[in-house]
Amino acid sequence: MIDHNIRTGKAFFGRRKGKRLRNSQLVLIKKLFPTLDINLNNSVPLNLTSLFSRKVKEVRLEIGFGGGEHLLHEMKHFPQTGFIGIEPFINGMAKMLMSLEEHKQYQNQLRLYNDDATGLLDWLPNASLDGIDLFYPDPWPKKKHWKRRFINMKNLNRFARVLKTGKKFRFASDIESYVNWTLYHCSNHHSFEWEAKNPKDWKTPYTLWSGTRYEAKALREGRAPTYLTFIKK
């Protein structure tokens, strides 16, 4: 019997786990994940593109990639971009690894991190990212829990430090209170400017947008997504 609370290197199993993992997923987490994992104990690279075995021209970050569908879509359409994906939930990471096992050509274009995003953000060099995506994060809908939302001034400071000038932070959600919360915080941060000029800009999906499973669920339940884009000044 496989122990689902074992650890592989860093704290990985035994936390933020939903459905029981299949043996094939456990094998990939043990063998494939360590080859893609970003170890924060290592020295910070002077050039972030050196993290990838493929030659890439830029690096983008997606925080909370779920099952990885959007990341796979982006890698297909942007072959000269290296991607860093953060997903603390084990089941989502396992799904991503299964996809990478099937589409091995993307393994040299992606690095993964399975813990708190703030740790990785603090490790990254200044002005090293060409984009940050945060799509359908946990909305913490109860007002007393809003302080737990990922968007806050401290994390926006982190974004501002690692994003290059002129590059984009993209945020999508179907929860109106979180959209308004994000607009408020970004509008009051000196390093970010909202790109929208008219309502169409935040109601229209991003160029080459693939959607996510969370967005599909929102649409089925009658909630309209909002797509925000902020430029790093």
From Swiss-Prot:
Q: What is its EC number?
A: 2.1.1.33
Active-site annotation: 138
**Enzyme type, top EC level:** transferase
Q: Where does substrate bind?
A: 142, 174, 212-215
Keyword Transferase present in the record's keywords: the answer is yes
Query: What keywords would UniProt list here?
Result: Methyltransferase, S-adenosyl-L-methionine, Transferase, tRNA processing
Briefly, what is this protein's role? Catalyzes the formation of N(7)-methylguanine at position 46 (m7G46) in tRNA.
Family membership, please give it.
Belongs to the class I-like SAM-binding methyltransferase superfamily. TrmB family.
Q: What is this protein called?
A: tRNA (guanine-N(7)-)-methyltransferase
- Organism of derivation: Bartonella henselae (strain ATCC 49882 / DSM 28221 / CCUG 30454 / Houston 1)
> Taxonomy-wise, where does this protein's organism fall, top ranks first?
Bacteria, Pseudomonadati, Pseudomonadota, Alphaproteobacteria, Hyphomicrobiales
